[in-house]
């Protein structure tokens, strides 16, 4: 009988956030797939858990994923963890989930802390709709294309960033998006946790000197609805809604989605659909 892969969340800084269910899961499985076994060993030692581990990270995920799945198919249970937070989110564990799906292996989630959701919650920005953009590429062309594709994004945007890349990213956000609200969230759940609610302009001028230290989540205000892009017309908005309807969306849902894309009011688009 095949085993189970447990997708297990770990603390993002404060060990007190490790849930009893997560601890019980790591205690009960046959082995643990860890992004960095040295980091996970510290967590296990803190909670007195002794369990064999295998490394599973970006550069060995293809070969190691097959080995992990083979062991699960032979009846072993495995927990996958990342260094901090939920595995499989902006993380090579995503590929292991896909492999499990292909091979019919059952997966169970053991929820834990999430830097994305935690940062959004304290950002002071709109939380109803948001998009997680992960880390921006270090490649200048790819980075520019990524940011350029978000210029008309109305939803709140969330980025991860490393300390050594933060200065350039702050300058880029102001360059591509103009002056918008920005929350710089650093060292979540740790001793020096801080939420800096500012603007892209102020951040580019005052925080791009490399003085801020730690791990960062950047939460950026989306484009305001009234800022209609010149490239969109009402006709385009209505056509967009009609395509959504053809694909199975209800008229009200289609109008709402087309409004979020083009900046026109939902009711304005809906009237044209009737």
Model-based region annotation:
Residues 1-58:
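Glycine-rich, flexible N-terminal cofactor/catalytic loop recognition
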Residues 2, 156, 163-274:
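A contiguous loop/helix-start segment that scaffolds small-molecule binding in enzyme catalytic cores
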Residues 3-5, 75-79, 155-156:
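Loop/turn-to-beta-strand initiation segments
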Residues 12-13, 83-87, 163-165, 223-225:
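Short glycine-rich anion-binding loops that position phosphate/pyrophosphate groups of nucleotides
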Residues 26-32, 105-108, 156-157:
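Short active-site oxyanion
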Residues 56-62, 136-139:
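Conserved helicase motor
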Residues 92-94, 251:
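Glycine-centered tight-turn and secondary-structure capping sites
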Residues 95-153:
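Class I SAM-dependent methyltransferase SAM-binding "motif I" and its flanking Rossmann-like core
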């Amino acid at each position: 009988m095949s085993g189970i892969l447990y997708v297990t969340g770990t603390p993002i800084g404060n060990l007190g956030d490790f849930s009893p269910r997560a601890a019980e899961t790591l205690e009960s499985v046959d082995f643990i797939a860890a992004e960095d076994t040295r980091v996970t060993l510290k967590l296990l030692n803190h909670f007195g858990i002794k369990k064999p581990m295998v490394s599973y990270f970006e550069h060995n995920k293809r070969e190691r994923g097959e080995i992990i799945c083979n062991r699960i198919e032979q009846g072993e249970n495995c927990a996958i963890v990342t260094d901090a937070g939920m595995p499989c989110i902006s993380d090579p564990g995503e590929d292991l989930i896909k492999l499990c799906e292909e091979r019919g292996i059952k997966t169970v989630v053991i929820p834990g802390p999430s830097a994305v959701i935690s940062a959004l919650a304290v950002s002071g920005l709109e939380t109803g709709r948001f998009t997680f953009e992960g880390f921006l590429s270090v490649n200048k062309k790819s980075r520019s294309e990524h940011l350029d594709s978000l210029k008309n994004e109305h939803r709140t945007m969330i980025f991860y960033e490393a300390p050594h890349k933060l200065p350039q990213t702050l300058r880029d956000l102001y360059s591509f998006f103009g002056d918008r609200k920005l929350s710089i969230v650093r060292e979540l759940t740790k001793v020096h946790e801080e939420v800096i609610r500012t603007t892209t302009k102020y951040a580019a001028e005052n925080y791009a000197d490399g003085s801020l230290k730690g791990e960062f989540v950047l939460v950026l205000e989306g484009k305001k609805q009234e800022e209609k892009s010149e490239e969109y017309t009402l006709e385009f908005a209505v056509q967009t809604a009609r395509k959504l309807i053809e694909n199975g969306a209800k008229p009200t849902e289609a109008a709402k989605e087309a409004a979020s894309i083009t900046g026109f009011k939902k009711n304005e688009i809906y009237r044209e659909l009737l």
